[in-house]
Structures are given as structure tokens and as C-alpha cells.
Amino acid sequence: MPLRIRLYTEPAQLANVNAAEQAEMSFKAELPSRQAQLSALQSTEEFDVLIVGGGATGSGCALDAVTRNLKTALVERDDFSSGTSSRSTKLIHGGVRYLQKAIMKLDYEQYMMVKEALHERSNLLDIAPHLSAPLPIMLPVYKWWQLPYYWAGIKMYDLVAGGQCLKSSYVLSKTKALELFPMLKKDKLVGAIVYYDGQHNDARMNLSIALTVARYGAAIANYTEVVHLLKKTDPQTGKEKVCGAHCRDVITGQEFDVRAKCVINATGPFTDSLRKMDEPNIPNICQPSAGVHIVIPGYYSPDNMGLLDPATSDGRVIFFLPWEKMTIAGTTDTPTDVTAHPIPMEEDINFILSEVRHYLSPDVEVRRGDVLAAWSGIRPLVTDPNSKDTQSICRNHIVNVSDSGLVTIAGGKWTTYRSMAEETLNEAISVHGLRAGHSKTIGLLLEGGKDWTPTMYIRLVQDYGLEVEVAQHLASTYGGRAFEVAKMAHVTGKRWPIVGKRLVSEFPYIESEVLYAIKEYACTATDVIARRTRLGFLNVQAADEALPRIVELMGKELGWSEQKKKEELATAKQFLYCEMGYKSRSEQLTSMSEITLTNPEVERYKKRFHKFDKESKGFITTVDVQRVLKNIGIQIDENSLHEILNEVDLNKNGQVELNEFLQLMNAVNKGQVSDNRLAILMKTAEESLDQREPVSVDRSGGGV
């Protein structure tokens, strides 16, 4: 089949939305409920545009369409940002390495791609200031000749950005570099170069785009899948044309038609699946690639300084970045199959750890057990069907219009989602003869962007009695909407904080966020831990601890039965286990079949174990642990204790045998496992009990 393809590399015309234009666009003070959105999808006779896909690109297309006064609909078969858009490196960047290739190969297309991305970077930082910020990134230099080489490249990056350069790059001496990044490897270090890019909370950014779309009057619904495309015969040409989609509400199973003059395919890695609904025999254009990231404790990087390894052992680029008080490291680039549930592979996790160790000081031991979460995102790389080499990967994105009028936007990257959306709508308007004005999304504030200031968290503390850390978190997550979340917070019953019960003690997420998440179209517990909060991406164990309370809160609000609650809990745990690296973390215990502890270590750990196993049964249960903890004044509910023991209970018989405990301590000693709750609890209990033991006359030296 012949394809109409347009490759885009030119940056969009930058022109901010003026006040008069914004006044013309209707804006809803209250978000319609999901049920109201589904009703709108079913009752509207015909939309101008139906977008399939609720990631960054699809949501961006919907925002561009609705702000041009087009009657707009969007459906997403999972949750908004459930795919690639929530699994990025969290950078808003132009692409330093693309610029390097452009200069080295005199490639104008690469140069224009970087220029476009730098324009879009500036806009994205402006329209969602609460979710994004400039981040300095250090490029350490270990050979003298590399210093002028890298400096020239980074300066060119600044020059291409022009007036939208975030901050000017600069060179650091070895001493200053180590002062700013103390964990850096000192040996042979000659200095460093620091440049600036943007960083954001990707899933929340995606959600903010989608919520802004809803505010402007579009009908959008998550958990609504396309079963098949609708077609009708064009009376003028006699050809079949796409005129909508037959959809199914994944939650209720209800099916209905959504009719539209134009259908846009913005399904990322699933691009070809929807294209084949239109033309079954069409060749694939998507070549999926998996990118794995890991999260390790925040103390491995400075609070406000990232690190770039420009040349890994296999020629890739690795970023090492502070994010949400943790440290992200990644990414990999491996061909993969398209799946809705990508799993981070152990070899990719170990590759990233190996590269990180290469750049950090030898006395900073990065252990496998330090990995708190890991994920894999599928990049939807695309081929250009018009190219002579049909296997060559297109370095940017493509817009494709099929013979039946299905518009497909594929490829690209997070930073350029807005310009991609603008170009897609321009093509859709042209092909389908839609009546619409120019794009209005440059400078258009996203959900929460209005009324946000860097100091608004102080008002949250003063007006509501929230902890400072919680107030800062709410401000940086919800922006101007943070006050709505604070109003929903329950009284703690403590002197301070007055309101805001945390879901888990070490993270600033509070219970009212779960209730607010439902207003933001969260339908499952996974939506809350993965995309409304980011707990699942930061620490899988903490997310696992928070799940029972999250399910309880959602169940009460949504009227879930006990059976539904159990199913939700199980599904969310499965998500953590498979997609967020909990499986790999757990396997560090089971893989350590050979115990290599020394005899003194074995005796020490046996002694610790028997402080809980008073009857010398050879195993301990929640009752044993609860009894000891109560004795030293620590109270943990039985459900939480069951979860703690279950992490170590390898044969899943409801108890922890001595051998299982020794395997745990063996893994802890080798750095295979860290932050294990049972290990920490038992050590704390042992120390507390030892302090209480009476000192014998012999040990006191005799006398009275």
C-alpha cells in the first residue's frame, strides 16, 4: 500500500498563547468524572478528532486539537502514561550526543532535531514549572585532550539553544569537581564540564497534559480500548474511510461506538497493532527497543547534580541523576518484543551497576542489593517506509496517513511531544478538511501550573499544619492544585503535623492523595503507586507496604467488595514483582543457595535467630517476632509482619527457617540484598535485648 509520509525536523513556530486567545477557550473549574467522560464519548454524534493513546504524544495531540476548538475525544486502553511515557530517564533534553553526531558527520537533520528539542525544552519548563526544573549535569574528564573536545561540544549545545539556554556551561578543576561530586572516582581525573538540561516527573507531566485536555472540554477516558476501527464508504471516491472506533470499557466490559471525522493513532510501541486494524497486511514500521533504568539510594549522588558517562564499555550513554531524593541510573538499549508489561532483565541491571561503579570512587561500593526499583521502557523507534533502506531507523518521528485516512504519529521523544502533536494536527486538518485555527499550545500552562510559586509550600504549612517535607512534595506534584489535596487531608491526632497521615513513614505521600487520585481518573491501586504518586518507581518495598492502606481507601471511596479489594491488591503486587524489579530483588535471596558465611558469623546469626526462636523449633513465625518486638516496645501490626516475613520465606510455608535466615544474612553480607526489613528488625531487637541483660559479677570485675 502506498503511504503518505511526512518527516518532521523543522522546529515549530514559537508564539505564546495570548490572553485573548486563552479567554476564547472554555475551561472547566471541576474535572468531569470518568463516568461523565464515558457518557460524553457515547452520546456525542460525531467528534472532529478521536485520538487513540493516552501517553505524552496522544495527550499532546488531544490538547492541540481541543485548544483549536476541535471537538476532541481520547481513549487509552490502560492508564494515562502507563507505557513508555512513565518509564523515561526523567530528562527534558535536546540530546547532547545527537549534536555530537551532527557536528562530526555534518548532518543538518540531526542539528535541526537538536534545535527543535531545545526550543521545546524551554517551553516545557515554562508551562509546568512545578513538575520540571533545570538540572546541572557533570561530565567528568579523565584525559587532558578530552577537555577542550568536550568543552567545545557543550558550548555548541549552549549556542544552539540561543536565548533559551537554561544556564551557561562551565569547566571545573579536579578539586572543585570532587567538592561538588565527592563520590566521583579521583584516579586520573583532570577536571569536569557542567552543562544544564531539564528534569521532570514524567508520569505526572503526562497526567497534567491529559487533565488539561479534560479541563478544556475534551472527552477522555482511560481503561477504554479500541476493539476495531469503524469504516464507511466515501461517496465521492468509493473507497473505505476510517470514521471512528468500536470501544470497550475495560472495567465494566460495556462496548460502544465513538464516531469521528479523523482518527489519530498515537499508541507508541503499539503503533503497528492499530495500523493493522486498518490494513491487516501492511508492513510494520515500529522497531521496539528496551531501555532499563534502576533506582538506588539518594546518597549515591549530590542533591542537585547529575552525571553523564558519554562512552560506556559498549558505546552507550549512561546518566546518573538525582530524582525525588533518590538516584536514577540508566539506560540500556536492547531490541525487544512489544509488550504491555516489560520486565527489567537482570543482565541489564548488572550492566548499569557495572558502569556506575566505573565512575564512582572505589571506596563507594554500589551493591546489587542497593537497587530499590528497576523498570524497562519500550522506545517506539520507527523506520521510514520511503527510505531505500527500509530497515534504517528514523532518527526523529514520522506522520503517516493511510489510504483510508488513519493518521499515525510514531517515534520521537518526550521533549518534543508538543511540536509532534502540532505537526500531527496540521496534517490531520489538511487531509480531512477540518476547520480549525493555528496551534495554541506554546506557553499554555498545564494542570497545576497556574498560581504555583517556589514558596507556595510555606502557605500549605501555615494554613493546614502540614509537615514541611509533605508540603514541598504537594507543591511540586500538584502545583496550584495542592491546596485541594491539603483540604482533603485528615487530622493526625498529633500535636504536629496537624493534618496529613503518611502512607509510609519515609516518603512524603499522604492518604488524601489517594482520594485525590480518584478525581484524577485513577481506577486501580497500581495507578496510585505508579503514576499518581511515584512510590512504585522509588522503592518497591515501600510501595508494597503502602498497598493495603491504598486499597482500603480506594475501596471505601469506590465501593469495592472484599473480593475486589483482594484482586486489586494482588494485581498491584504483581506489577511491583514483575515490572518494578521486585522479582529481581527477591531472586537475590533464592539465588544464594551456597552459604559462604564464616563459622563465627554463622554462630553470631544463630544466636540472633534463637532470641526469637525461644522453643528451638528451628523456625520463627509472626507470633515469635511480635512477642520479641512487644518486649522491646516496638509495635507492628500482624499484616505488616506477615509481609516482612514473606520476603524471606523462600518456600512460602508461612515461617522462616534457620537456613532461610542464614541465606538472608549471607546475601546481606555480600551486598546482594540491602534494607531488608526482617534483617534490620532482628538486629535492632538483638541489640536492645543485649543492653537489657544484667551484667554478671565476673564481667563487672567483682565488688559491689
Predicted regions: what they are:
Residues I51-V52, V258-G268:
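Short hydrophobic core segments
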Residues E45-F47, I251-C262:
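Core beta-strand elements of the Rossmann-like FAD/NAD(P) dinucleotide-binding domain
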Residues S81-K115:
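Glycine-rich active-site loop/strand segments that organize a redox cofactor
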Residues V66-S88:
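Glycine-rich FAD pyrophosphate-binding loop
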Residues F47-L74:
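N-terminal Rossmann-like FAD-binding beta1-loop-alpha1 element of flavoenzymes
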Residues D78, L131, M138, Y142-K155, ...:
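C-terminal accessory subdomains/tails of enzymes that are appended
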Residues N222-C243:
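A conserved short coil-to-beta-strand element within the FAD-binding core of flavoproteins
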